[in-house]
Every structure is written in structure tokens, then in C-alpha cells.
Amino acid sequence: MFKLTSSPHIHSGKLTARIMLWVIFGMLPALAVQVYYFGFGVLIQICLAVALALILEFAVTKLRKKPSLFYISDFSVILTALILAMAIPPYAPYWVILIGTFCAVILGKHVYGGLGQNLFNPAMVGYVVLLISFPVQMTGWMPPISLLHEPPTFGDSLGLIFSGVTGDGFSLSQLVSSIDGLSSATPLDSAKTWLKSGGSATDLLNQPIFLPGLEAGLGWLQVNLAFFIGGLFLIWKKAIHWQTPVAILLSLGIFCGLFDLFGNAQAVGFFAQLFSGAMMFGAFFIATDPVTAPVTPKGKWVFGILIGLLICLIRQFGNYPDGVAFAVLLANICVPLIDQYTRPRVAGYGLNGRN
């Protein structure tokens, strides 16, 4: 006897849970590098985000009378929490990640009906809510711990996140200000502020957070390289499509080259654009979300080019130094339109004056 089931009857065998696990696995190198350069804070943020995300997923699916364990076991909510936790400053107060996780899971996902129904990337919804609502907490990045006199221990990291001070009573700002030339700003933020104030690129690169001779920051370059390697792994495993990240990086390079060509004094160099902030993170792990990205190869190219253009414009003219999250969300709005104009025509379309 054959069992009657709904389509599709032929599939690739790539279950949602398997793809999510590959993406999580691809993020592990960047996580290890981030812990090495910026301390244990990111691990604590991940634990808080994942714990709350699982609780919310369980509660909402129960309220909607759906099988909670089935939806939790696809690992999508864990991936959302992981992306959000790795995107925020490692030593942000604990309530920041809790609010962001709530917004990501509830507002970014379940308001639209759950996995597969959301218009926007859930993690970026949570991130943008935090960035707009709590700009001070969301811009307080720890410089690489190798530049500090005494790198924070795991206990110090717990203290900074839950009480705002280490075991010795030092706040994050006090730890940073103890070293001349250091600030809690990211290299992109420092470069944007410095160049807008009329400072020279040579003096900018002499700051301790920048690698000698490069506009990319210490720690940030290595984290972006790790995300790049993880992204190549995902492409190799066919967990993501290559068109979107390639389109983002190529378009960003072209538009940044145009700014350099016309001599924009406030423009950050091409190398810094690619290997600073959340560039590789966004290109390979955020913009490639299959739910919120176009479905056709041509659409993925258009989507990636749009994101690259928006990132370049926000970084050059906007108030925010990075712009990846805003670019992805703005491009998400355009996905239905992109799909409409890039999907292949059905055979026989337009024959005899009929569609």
C-alpha cells in the first residue's frame, strides 16, 4: 500500500535542522577567535540568549497548540540567538541581550507566523531594536584584551555583564581608559569619527586598535577572516547559495572604489570595508537566510548588490558606522518585488494573448 502525502514528493534531503547545524558549525571558528581577542563575554551572552530563546519558543508554540519539541529541534531559534549574541558587544548588560532575544523571537519570527513566514531576519530585528533603543550600551565594545594591562577573567566577565564592574570594582570604561589611545569604539566608528573631524589616515592608523599599515582593526580582521572561512565551508557544504555573498562583496568593492576614485575624504579604504565590523558575518551568515532572501539565482544577485550598495551608503553618509543590519532589513523589504521580477516565466506564458 502506498501512503498518500502532499507535495513535494522529490526533495534534496537537506532537512532544516541539518542546514541550521551546518551554519552553527560554520560560526564556531569566528566564535573561538572572538573569545580569544575580546574575552569570555560573548560566551555568557550566548548562554543567556539561547536559554531565553528556547523558553520563548517553547511557550509560544505551546500557546499556538503546536508541537514545541518539533519546532525546537530544528535549531532555528538557537541559530537566531547565536547570531544576535555574537553581534552585540560582549560586555553589554545582561538585560540588553534578553530584550534583544525577546524582540528577535517574538517580533521578528512568531508575529509573522513562525519559521518560514517571517519577512525580516529575526536576529537583525532584535539587533536594530537594541541599536536604536540603547545606543550607548550597543556601542561599548571592549578593545582587544591583549591591549589591556589585566584581561578580564571569566569571573570579571560575569561581573561586567550582571553588575557593571569586575571583581576588583572596575567598570568597562575604567578598564579601557587605563590605556592611552584606547576607546570603546570599534575601528569603523573610530575611523568614521576621525576622518570626519579632518584627521589624516596616517594618524588614524597609528592608534593601537589598528594593525600596522592596515585600516582593519586588531581582532576585527581576524574575526572577519574566520567568518569568511566559515562561509566558504557553508558554500562547500551547499548549506547556503554563493550568489548573495559574492554579490555583496563585489558590489561593496565597486561602490567603495567609486568613492575612492572621486576622492571622498571621509571614505574608509576598501580593505577596511571588507574586514571590519560585521561585513563577513553579514555576507555569509545573515543575508543568506533562506526564508528572507530571494529564491532565484538572479534574485540573489540583485539582493546582494542592493545590500552592498546600502552598506556603502550607510557607512559613508549615515550616522551608524557599520550598516549591515539596516542594509539587510531594508533589502528584506524588497524581496517580494525582487522575486516577482526575477522568477522564470512559466512555459506558455503570453501565448494567444493569455497569461
Curated annotation (Swiss-Prot):
A GO CC annotation recorded here is: plasma membrane
Q: Which cofactor does it need?
A: FMN
Biological process GO annotation list?
A: electron transport chain; transmembrane transport
Annotated InterPro entries: NqrB/RnfD, RnfD_bac
Q: What do we know about how this protein assembles, alone or with others?
A: The complex is composed of six subunits: RnfA, RnfB, RnfC, RnfD, RnfE and RnfG.
Assigned EC number: 7.-.-.-
Q: What is its main location?
A: membrane
As for subcellular location, the record says: Cell inner membrane
Coiled-coil annotated residue ranges, if any: none
What membrane topology does the UniProt entry give? Multi-pass membrane protein
Tell me which PANTHER family the record gives.
ELECTRON TRANSPORT COMPLEX PROTEIN RNFD (PTHR30578), ION-TRANSLOCATING OXIDOREDUCTASE COMPLEX SUBUNIT D (PTHR30578:SF0)
User: What functional role does this protein have?
Assistant: Part of a membrane-bound complex that couples electron transfer with translocation of ions across the membrane.
Which family is this sequence assigned to?
Belongs to the NqrB/RnfD family.
Keywords associated with the record: Cell inner membrane, Cell membrane, Electron transport, Flavoprotein, FMN, Membrane, Phosphoprotein, Translocase, Transmembrane, Transmembrane helix, Transport
| Keyword Transport carried by entry | yes
Which chain regions cross the lipid bilayer?
13-33, 35-55, 77-97, 98-118, 128-148, 216-236, 245-265, 267-287, 294-314, 318-338
The protein's name: Ion-translocating oxidoreductase complex subunit D
Pfam family, any one: NQR2_RnfD_RnfE
Q: Which residues carry this modification: FMN phosphoryl threonine?
A: 186
